[in-house]
């Protein structure tokens, strides 16, 4: 398999939209064939890159697109809240399945594999790395380790109530400190995605608003229910 160089990946992603094609778990669209179709449609629509979860899904998508792919594996562990690419074997599997960028949880939480070990393994493989972080301190630490992209992915998801709006301030702060930032997390309208780029994000990832049909339909239904008259 021929691979894109780091420079080629960065050039393609600059100021671009990454479509996260992750259907609802065990839903009617949760199959590699449908994920591959989602991915192909996203690229036709102009997505600069894709974020794909799962080895089978990644293999199916890699066959039909040539844009950069951020690969992850999600797991539910009994002894750790970390879900995103928690093991070194996950990193190896993602690389061999065709991921150009391998994303892992960069939060400061109990975990089966250290952040340092994850970053080092990705570097050894020659892939690009992305750390899904929840705050400024985590992002800066991952940058010091040489991680290529710092994601705001986990902001609002490590405890307490999840805000409705994305954490644009975190993007600003990380950019101001020299990080190459992937804005991610609740960028669920075109306007919010544009705000991320305006505030210095290298690229922006959008997921549920593009590819989780169950969520999108429920947003419309809820809005209609809230405005019902004469019921």
Curated annotation (Swiss-Prot):
Keyword ATP-binding belongs to the record: no
InterPro entries: Aldolase_TIM, NanE, RibuloseP-bd_barrel
CDD domains: NanE
Entry keyword set: Carbohydrate metabolism, Isomerase
Keyword Isomerase: yes
EC number(s) given by UniProt: 5.1.3.9
GO biological process, one term: N-acetylneuraminate catabolic process
GO cellular component: cytosol
Catalytic activity: an N-acyl-D-glucosamine 6-phosphate = an N-acyl-D-mannosamine 6-phosphate
SUPFAM superfamilies according to UniProt: Ribulose-phoshate binding barrel
Listed pathway(s): Amino-sugar metabolism; N-acetylneuraminate degradation; D-fructose 6-phosphate from N-acetylneuraminate: step 3/5
Molecular functions per Gene Ontology: N-acylglucosamine-6-phosphate 2-epimerase activity
Biological role stated in the UniProt entry: Converts N-acetylmannosamine-6-phosphate (ManNAc-6-P) to N-acetylglucosamine-6-phosphate (GlcNAc-6-P).
HAMAP family in alphabetical order: ManNAc6P_epimer (MF_01235)
The family this protein is said to belong to: Belongs to the NanE family.
Protein name per its UniProtKB record: Putative N-acetylmannosamine-6-phosphate 2-epimerase
């Amino acid at each position: 398999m021929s691979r894109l160089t780091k420079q080629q990946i960065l050039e393609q992603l600059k100021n671009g939209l990454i479509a996260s094609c992750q259907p609802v778990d065990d839903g009617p669209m949760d199959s590699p064939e449908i994920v591959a179709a989602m991915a192909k449609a996203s690229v036709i629509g102009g997505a600069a890159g894709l974020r794909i979860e799962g080895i089978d899904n990644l293999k199916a998508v890699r066959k039909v697109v040539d844009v950069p792919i951020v690969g992850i594996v999600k797991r539910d562990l009994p002894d750790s809240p970390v879900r995103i690419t928690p093991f070194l074997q996950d990193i190896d599997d993602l690389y061999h399945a065709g991921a150009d960028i391998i994303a892992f949880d960069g939060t400061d939480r109990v975990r089966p594999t250290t952040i340092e070990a994850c970053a080092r393994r990705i570097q050894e493989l020659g892939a690009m790395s992305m750390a899904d972080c929840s705050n400024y301190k985590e992002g800066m630490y991952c940058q010091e380790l040489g991680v290529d992209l710092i994601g705001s992915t986990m902001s609002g998801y490590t405890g307490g109530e999840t805000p409705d709006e994305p954490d644009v301030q975190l993007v600003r702060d990380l950019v101001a400190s020299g990080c190459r930032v992937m804005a991610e997390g609740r960028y669920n309208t075109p306007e919010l995605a544009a705000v991320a780029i305006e505030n210095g994000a290298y690229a922006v990832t959008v997921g549920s608003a593009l590819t989780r049909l169950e969520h999108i339909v429920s947003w419309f239904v809820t809005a209609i229910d809230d405005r019902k008259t004469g019921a």
